[in-house]
């Protein structure tokens, strides 16, 4: 399915709620169970993090989750195996969030073959500059897996247009300067930034980094096509507050109907 499965998540004006889970945090059985739960709860896409020892874009919550996964001996191969098994039970799109180093260490051809086998539909590589994306972009295109671009508040318009014109899946619009993590509120300029990104791409635009309340979700999906919620989802899963994740999903769907 690949790119088409991601596109379907945004069809007919659907607003996407994209939770992030760290692969192997709590074990690989837990990863499969969390994917099943998020699918049943109505999430649009699930973003799965590949743990890495130097996660430069991650805030403290995601860093701790990655460290727990690495400390428990979780491997990239193990995560792929868990995704292969999860894919037999769910049709929700899988998007991997991985730094470039684990891809190259695993072998980029082998990594993408494993993605295909596991039914991965898209990949986000936060430390891969646009100018260097040919390291993996042609292989991903051949495999029908979306290389999802990140744009930031400081990205000039021309750069946004260039990055998004060659991309597939959706555009990940980073809503804060700095790392991921829970924020209390967003500055007014974020609204004009998201509108600017939307006006310069044919792809759905998803807001991410720092989204941690239902109010944030409601605010963001009035402007763009969906949200990624990472640190907050990890906290809620860790504290067994799953009903709050369902409330986030409901907040997204309500805006869809508005």
Swiss-Prot record:
Protein name, as recorded: Tryptophan synthase alpha chain
Keywords, sorted A to Z: Amino-acid biosynthesis, Aromatic amino acid biosynthesis, Lyase, Tryptophan biosynthesis
Pfam families per record: Trp_syntA
Pathways involved: Amino-acid biosynthesis; L-tryptophan biosynthesis; L-tryptophan from chorismate: step 5/5
One GO molecular-function entry: tryptophan synthase activity
Enzyme class, UniProt record, top EC level: lyase
One cellular component term from this protein's GO annotations in UniProt: cytosol
InterPro entries membership: Aldolase_TIM, RibuloseP-bd_barrel, Trp_synthase_alpha_AS, Trp_synthase_suA
Family annotation (HAMAP family): Trp_synth_alpha (MF_00131)
Family: Belongs to the TrpA family.
Swiss-Prot/TrEMBL catalytic activity: (1S,2R)-1-C-(indol-3-yl)glycerol 3-phosphate + L-serine = D-glyceraldehyde 3-phosphate + L-tryptophan + H2O
Lyase keyword on record: yes
Statement: the UniProt record of this protein carries the keyword Amino-acid biosynthesis: yes
Protein function: The alpha subunit is responsible for the aldol cleavage of indoleglycerol phosphate to indole and glyceraldehyde 3-phosphate.
SUPFAM superfamilies: Ribulose-phoshate binding barrel
Lineage: superkingdom: Bacteria
EC code(s) of this entry: 4.2.1.20
Signal peptide: none
Family matches, as PROSITE patterns: TRP_SYNTHASE_ALPHA
Gene: trpA
